[in-house]
Amino acid sequence: MVDFAFELRKVQDTGKIVMGAKKSIHLAKVGGAKLIIVARNARPDIKEDIYYYAKLSGIPVYEFEGTSVELGTLLGRPHTVSALAVIDPGESKILALAGGKE
């Protein structure tokens, strides 16, 4: 079993992520991400756009079980994070969460 919090911190340290719903939706549209993570309580229109464009681009989406506040806290941010895109997983195994290709 992959520990989400551990792997998220690992990808933040060794890989490349982009935080924010607008940037994640943009990367879903252009196919520039390997995985998109969305908070459980993200606005419905944001989730709908992310799932729609990610499906078109073949990008896996992982729905984080916690809230956007908890996701922000895991990332060490003092604000909410509704969505983030993993561009480079680095040394983490975070792509295994959503069945993405490593």
Swiss-Prot record:
GO MF term set: RNA binding; structural constituent of ribosome
Gene3D superfamilies, per database record: 3.30.1330.30
GO biological process, one term: translation
Name listed for the protein in its UniProt record: Large ribosomal subunit protein eL30
Domain of life: Archaea
Self-association state and partner proteins as the record states: Part of the 50S ribosomal subunit.
NCBIfam families given in the database record: PRK01018.1
Gene Ontology cellular-component annotations: cytosolic large ribosomal subunit
Family annotation (PROSITE patterns): RIBOSOMAL_L30E_2
Transmembrane domains' residue ranges: none
Organism in which the protein naturally occurs: Thermococcus kodakarensis (strain ATCC BAA-918 / JCM 12380 / KOD1)
Alphabetical list of InterPro entries matching this protein: Ribosomal_eL30 (IPR000231), Ribosomal_eL30-like (IPR039109), Ribosomal_eL30-like_sf (IPR029064), Ribosomal_eL30_CS (IPR022991), Ribosomal_eL8/eL30/eS12/Gad45 (IPR004038)
Family the entry assigns: Belongs to the eukaryotic ribosomal protein eL30 family.
Record's keyword terms, sorted: Ribonucleoprotein, Ribosomal protein
Record-linked Pfam families: Ribosomal_L7Ae (PF01248)
